[in-house]
Amino acid sequence: MASAFSLLTAGGAKFDKNRFKDDFQLFEAKKRKDRKGKSKQIDALAAGSALPSSLDFFGDHPHPQHKPEPEPESESESDFESDSGSSSTSIPAPPPQKITLTGSEPLPKSLHTNLPSLVNHESHSLTSAEGGPLLSALSRANIHSLWGVQCAVGGCLLEDRDTLCVAPTGSGKTLSYVLPTIVKLREPARKLKGTEEGKGVRALVVVPTHDLAVQIQGVIKAVTMGRHWRSMVLTKATEKAVWESAPGEAVKTGEDGDSEMKDGEDSGDEEEDEDDNESTGSVDEFAPKVSGNPEGLGIDVLVATPERLHHLIDSRRISLARTKYVILDESDRLLSSDFLPQVEPILSACSNPAVQKCFLSATMPAGAESLAKKWLKDGGVRVVVGVKDSAVTTVDQSLLYTGSESGKLLALRNLISSGQLPYPSLIFVQSIDRAEELYKTLVLDGIKVDAVHGGKAKTKRDEAIKDFRVGAVWMLVVTEVLARGMDFRGVKVVINYDFPQTVPSYIHRIGRTGRAGRPGKAITFFNIEDGPYLRTIANVLRSSGCPVPEYMLDMKKPTKNEKKKLAKAPPKRKAVGGGGRDLNREAGKKKKQMVEASKKRKMLERKGKGGNEEKNDDEE
């Protein structure tokens, strides 16, 4: 039987394709269709590192659009507005607010909201060759009109008046000084090469953090697209280019500077974090030489943090004598005791008789304002948008009692699991250690999260911010280093995990959401230790129209000493989560104590030996 079966099946089964040709082609056609469909999916995945539109928070990734007919080529979106949504929609303007101008008469006229009023101003009218590229760059960035603060500040600056501006977060302050500065410079330094006007640092922008400096540089690059303007951020890598463009006495004479900034030296605050993680080098390392820029090519706009710029001025490597426009962004922070020792010499170094100054911030305490007016001609023109020192009205603010540190973490997890914390979001904490603790905890929860603080190298911070903008990271745990100026238009919720130390800190933190008229949400956790300071923040919520429980408004006001104490240092808190012991941290502290004890012991031994030797010499 077996042999008969083998005989019948030895040749194998044969299929006559010619006989069943029609049936066979039906299956082949289906296979080809399936293969074609799969290849299209693979190609789409390969080319589409693009996210689905539901996950593309900032609008950075291209999404396919089906056009029935070919249309004229649309203007591409610029890097400046890469996080603001689709290039086909204009950026929504913030809600209209009352703008108050005070100062010596006659007060300057505000610009019209249409863009041509910027380049056709009677005192600084640009030609079509000068103004055309600027208008084109603004159009590419989806900017089709000026906002209130930009009209007011632009009018002041174009009429050569020093200006002090207080405007809410997200109202467009950066463009309010960048645009008129570009208009007043008229031509790039490259076109003015060899002339006095094209030498040195022509315009200077000073900001408290490196991250904000990089963001402002991006704005300048976007609005100067199409012309060869020279702008840069002052870093270790660009120091040489800066002092070659605006050489000081030490560079001209070939002498070494007479001062040296120590590694890691800062202003006592983590915000001046550019130098915290990389050595600035000694003066000998960057010994001044004869300028390698003999043509004297200047820098149109230099964006700098105070510590590094002050170092160059103090070592006589850079001259700001030709600088005609000086802007202090986040000026209340720059005029505080932490930065004032560096900022005052910078302002003094801008010795051009025609120098024009502009100070801007979302908050301006009385002390900082009086100090600012001393540096402004005739006290400057004071521009206030809305109510001074108030929170942005587009943010829904609330306070949440959590009871303890473990309660904070539980509340945060509940917000995430219940969908009340949509991505992308920012979580503010009070210190570097707590940022790292919370970051590690959330990573273990499986959340796409990163941390940004002054303890990280700037390259790591830049990478984390970039990932956050493109949607690769959904949450950022941050310290005060990102509380000011940073523009994340896609952020929907801000969590104050640790209670803010001051009202300005609270206003700047929650100002990272609800920008440019978009709705946002801010939730602030508080515990028993935050009780004495709860009333001040509750008053901010009430002034913004947010509901506040009556008991918070009836609480005792904090004393002046309590306010000063909190402003100097945040309250001590238990580890994030409040549960268990951090064995690694305890081991690190123990090791540090052992090293310090060993050093003291060796020092005492050396002193003891020295005393014995002196005694023996006396006896001899």
Curated annotation (Swiss-Prot):
Pfam families, per the entry: DEAD, Helicase_C
The enzyme's E.C. designation: 3.6.4.13
Keyword Membrane: no
Annotated organism of origin: Cryptococcus neoformans var. neoformans serotype D (strain B-3501A) (Filobasidiella neoformans)
GO CC annotation terms, alphabetical: cytosol; nucleolus
Annotated catalysed reactions: ATP + H2O = ADP + phosphate + H(+)
Residue window of motif DEAD box: 329-332
Enzyme class (EC, first level): hydrolase
Compositionally biased region (Basic residues): 562-575
Residue window of motif Q motif: 142-150
Intracellular or extracellular location(s): Nucleus, Nucleolus
Binding of ATP, residues: 167-174
Record protein name field: ATP-dependent RNA helicase ROK1
Gene behind the chain: ROK1
Lineage start: Eukaryota, Fungi, Dikarya, Basidiomycota, Agaricomycotina
InterPro entries membership: DEAD/DEAH_box_helicase_dom (IPR011545), DEAD_box_RNA_helicase (IPR050079), Helicase_ATP-bd (IPR014001), Helicase_C-like (IPR001650), P-loop_NTPase (IPR027417)
Main subcellular localisation: nucleus
Annotated spans, Disordered: 53-115, 244-292, 556-620
Domain Helicase ATP-binding: start-end pairs: 154-382
An example Gene Ontology molecular-function term: ATP binding
Presence of the UniProt keyword ATP-binding in the record: yes
